[in-house]
Design a protein with these regions (language model features):
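UBC/E2-like fold recognition across ubiquitin and ubiquitin-like conjugation systems
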Residues: 1-74, 80-166
Length: 166
């Protein structure tokens, strides 16, 4: 499946998200756009953490899977966003998500500096500034459903995600 959800980040003029501090003016405007997109599609489910810091900004997004389990995903916003692909982890329930021996078939990496499991959502070489945090979270949401499919059937996570294109 090809992801066709692209947002023309130049088409809309929005106020700055924040007093940009370490962010450039263009990054501040972009983060304002990202914030409005996330508020529209994930109302009351996204929490911005340190949004004025271009070295420690992140978002936590809460989701409920189709089976009713609750998860929180964390996205780390890189200091050169949107030029670089952000990292994403499963923050909660961190203890329930195991380490996977085969990173290729699980689409999950090692644990990060906070001890959370990294989730592969984009090939970093295919990332462009036209991708959005909304797309990152949607791919994370799909990973959660594939993970739950893995729990119920024993199939590799890749079984559910192998059809996804970048």
């Amino acid at each position: 499946m090809k992801w066709k959800t692209k947002v023309n980040v130049r088409a809309r003029k929005l106020p700055l998200l924040i007093n940009t501090m370490g962010w450039t003016a263009a990054q501040g405007k972009r983060l304002g756009l990202e914030k409005s997109i996330l508020e529209k599609y994930f109302p009351n489910r996204v929490n911005w953490i340190n949004p004025t810091s271009n070295t420690n900004a992140k978002i936590d997004a809460s989701f409920e899977s189709n089976s009713g389990r609750r998860y929180t995903m964390r996205v780390y916003i890189p200091n050169d966003f949107p030029s670089s692909c952000p990292n994403m982890v499963i923050k909660e329930p961190a203890s329930r998500i195991p380490d996977f021996p085969n990173l290729r078939t699980s689409h999950a990496g090692p644990r990060n500096h906070e001890g959370y499991l990294l989730i592969c959502h984009f090939d970093k070489s295919k990332w462009s500034g036209q991708h959005t945090l909304y797309e990152v979270l949607m791919k994370g949401r799909l990973w959660l459903e594939a993970y739950e499919g893995h729990l119920s059937t024993g199939n590799e996570i890749d079984y559910y995600l192998k059809h996804m294109g970048e």
